[in-house]
Amino acid sequence: MSLIEIKKVENKKDLKTFIDFHYDLYEGNEYDVPNLFSDEMNTLSKDKNAAFEFCEAEYYLAYKDGKLAGRVAAIINHKANSKWGKKSVRFGWIDFIDDREVSKALLDAVEKYGREKGMEDVVGPLGFTDMDPEGMLVWGFDQLGTMPTIYNYAYYPEHIEALEGFEVDNKYVEFKIMVPDEVPEKYAKIAMMIEKRYNLHVRKLTKKDIFQGGMGQKIFDLINDTYKDLYGYSELSQKQIDQLIKSYLGFLDFNLITCIEEWTDGEHKLIGVGITMPSLAHALRKCRRGRLLPFGWFHVLRAIKMHKTNIVDLLLIGILPEYRAKGANALLFADLIPWYQKYGIEWGETQVELETNAGVQGQWGALTPVMHKRRKCYKKIIK
């Protein structure tokens, strides 16, 4: 029998090894989209990620016969546990060679950590919050990954489902939606009608709106409100919101962000937002081992600012429930579709959606949606 050793990440050098393992394991894979090393370091560093206000975590490396063979993060989100009445330890950032002794040892380490912390079950793959990738790919292994989601080899779910005690906790789907030659008549008519009937209006943003006008704050307050009932969601803290505004919003193309406001008695109430961006999938694949230097930055800049891609990622779409029924999503897409056409975008990637979320999936109907990926989250009771 081979010797499997589990080592806890103790310092920055270990953390670098933890991050770099993914690049090594997926080198040459034509579908994996590696995250930027700097983003991974910021997310996993306990002194940098604002989620550690209410999360705690340990990271583990697995060695087989002295050679690095796997990694996993064990995460406890105390805010989510409190909100949902759970005592769960999450596993995330899980990667391993095709060896069932290795995958078992990694998940045993997560279970042991959870047991020591008084947790009652193991769930995952999940990150610290819903802003992190979640769900193990179980179908669609021949589809290009995206920056906001996990790509994994087909043997991963086989390993998890073969382990004693693990069962499926949730199922997710993702869709490819096509950019039409013209705004669908359905969207155009509804958009015109609700503008007049409900006084809903499109608002485009500037950097000044985001950083000085308070719109960045309003956007994430809205996201908290519209996502609050989703599986495992924990509301973003003020520190997280500040971090997201500073780190990400300012770098996006504001033409691809659409806000919807209700105008009443001089008040402009934000009721919906769509944050989309040119896909960085091909650009990130050109960043050697997730590094922006020496030439990775050029490919990322070309994608974001010069739109050198035909794919758009629909990162965050949030509309208050009472306005979804009024057709506010039609107003959103009636504004975004002409921008996609102008930039040469041919299709878009939705993000991870619960398989049971018919309301979200229904909004893609006029855009020829094709379900092309499936994911699962797993759960095991700690004994």
Identify the function of each model-found stretch:
Residues 177-180, 379-383:
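Short beta-strand-to-coil "C-cap" segments at the C-terminal boundary of structured domains/repeats
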